[in-house]
Design a protein with these regions (language model features):
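Cytosolic regulatory regions built on CNB/CRP/Popeye-like sensor folds
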Residues: 1-160
Length: 160
């Protein structure tokens, strides 16, 4: 039941009933990662959603010079890889355990098989997924606008 409560916190599952979350939980598996262990590798094929049950992970991206940049730290109740429930595109970042961490993993193939047999569950998932993507797009647009404004101000200062 603890994992069901964890699933309920994830935006794409927020509208699911308890019985539906129990179905999702049936296809989920827990895995423990040691500090420094690679959880997902940048450019590897996306294969599922990872929800952090406990611990701390870091999200890193390599630049064109091979330098690793930390983009974020994620802890208990946070998640990554949700887009791979729909799309098997390569991972955009690597995720590494900072400390011993346990993740609840929902593989794409298992999740797709689950919702394929249940139209209502499929509808709820894609509606929630679209809402999450729209929220992210809004934030990205705001960040892009802010970044353009900062660049404009820098150019003005450099002219003086």
């Amino acid at each position: 039941m603890e994992d069901v409560r964890l699933l309920k916190q994830i935006p794409i599952f927020r509208d699911f009933r308890t019985t539906e979350l129990l179905s999702v939980n049936m296809v989920a598996k827990s895995k423990v990662y040691k500090p420094g262990e690679l959880i997902v590798k940048e450019k590897a094929k996306g294969d599922g959603l990872y929800i952090i049950k406990r611990g701390l992970v870091k999200v890193v991206k390599q630049d064109s010079f091979g330098e690793e940049h930390i983009l974020a730290y994620l802890g208990e109740g946070e998640y990554f890889g949700e887009i791979s429930l729909v799309d098997k595109a390569p991972r955009s970042e690597s995720v590494i355990a900072e400390e011993e961490s346990e993740c609840l993993i929902i593989k794409q193939v298992d999740f797709q098989n689950l919702i394929a047999g249940n139209r209502e569950l499929e509808r709820k998932f894609y509606k929630s997924f679209a809402r999450v993507l729209c929220e992210r797009l809004r934030v990205t647009n705001e960040n892009l606008t802010f970044s353009k404004e900062i660049n404009r101000l820098i150019q003005e200062v450099e002219k003086k």
